[in-house]
Amino acid sequence: MTKTLYITAHPHDERASYSMAAGKAFIESYKEAHPDDEVIHLDLYRENIPQIDADVFSGWGKLQSGSGFEQLSEHEKAKVGRLNELSEQFIAGDKYVFVTPLWNFSFPPVMKAYFDAVAVAGKTFKYTEQGPIGLLTDKKALHIQARGGYYSEGQAAELEMGHRYISIMMQFFGVPEFEGLFIEGHNAEPDKAEEIKQNAIVRAKELGRTF
């Protein structure tokens, strides 16, 4: 059974967010076209996504020194254990769908925290004499991103770092197929906002059938 992780990083739902509206249209279409697939929704604003902090570094250090997991403090066990759960879940996925807004040229901080959780040497990539090699070579990924302005071309394209970051991480993990669905210009041209939204929903539904 194909397992798809639907990973959203937005505090709003589809009623207030263009990216979430497109994401909802995509995943509903995807489920209809792939009824036997397992879809797991990770709402990063509601999930427990530990940041890499002093407890995590301390816990990792103890484990690397030979201590057993039960010898960690309660805080260390909770955070290190949860990070392991997230990385194992990510590895078990076959397809990844990331849904984010473009905020200050990137995505919400919780998205970065999630990538920190799943970027684990020996799991999603490994180090070799020739450099790091991605281990997720049989996966595919999609990024749905809403941008109030226009960032697909021109000088503004150089400022966009959200999609570029996810693209870099997918390459780093060895994911061979990665594409983006962008909704842009609704703030720059508010009179066209509804048209932009509906066009994005149509494209999302089409992509959901073939992804």
Swiss-Prot record:
<dbReference type="InterPro" id="IPR023048">
    <property type="entry name" value="NADH:quinone_OxRdtase_FMN_depd"/>
</dbReference>
<dbReference type="InterPro" id="IPR029039">
    <property type="entry name" value="Flavoprotein-like_sf"/>
</dbReference>
<feature type="binding site">
    <location>
        <begin position="17"/>
        <end position="19"/>
    </location>
    <ligand>
        <name>FMN</name>
    </ligand>
</feature>
<dbReference type="GO" id="GO:0016655">
    <property type="term" value="F:oxidoreductase activity, acting on NAD(P)H, quinone or similar compound as acceptor"/>
</dbReference>
<dbReference type="GO" id="GO:0010181">
    <property type="term" value="F:FMN binding"/>
</dbReference>
<keyword id="KW-0520">NAD</keyword>
<protein>
    <recommendedName>
        <fullName>FMN-dependent NADH:quinone oxidoreductase 2</fullName>
        <ecNumber>1.6.5.-</ecNumber>
        <ecNumber>1.7.1.17</ecNumber>
    </recommendedName>
</protein>
<dbReference type="InterPro" id="IPR050104">
    <property type="entry name" value="FMN-dep_NADH:Q_OxRdtase_AzoR1"/>
</dbReference>
<keyword id="KW-0285">Flavoprotein</keyword>
<dbReference type="Pfam" id="PF02525">
    <property type="entry name" value="Flavodoxin_2"/>
</dbReference>
<comment type="function">
    <text>Quinone reductase that provides resistance to thiol-specific stress caused by electrophilic quinones.</text>
</comment>
<dbReference type="GO" id="GO:0016652">
    <property type="term" value="F:oxidoreductase activity, acting on NAD(P)H as acceptor"/>
</dbReference>
<comment type="similarity">
    <text>Belongs to the azoreductase type 1 family.</text>
</comment>
<comment type="function">
    <text>Also exhibits azoreductase activity. Catalyzes the reductive cleavage of the azo bond in aromatic azo compounds to the corresponding amines.</text>
</comment>
<comment type="subunit">
    <text>Homodimer.</text>
</comment>
<dbReference type="GO" id="GO:0009055">
    <property type="term" value="F:electron transfer activity"/>
</dbReference>
<keyword id="KW-0560">Oxidoreductase</keyword>
<dbReference type="InterPro" id="IPR003680">
    <property type="entry name" value="Flavodoxin_fold"/>
</dbReference>
<keyword id="KW-0288">FMN</keyword>
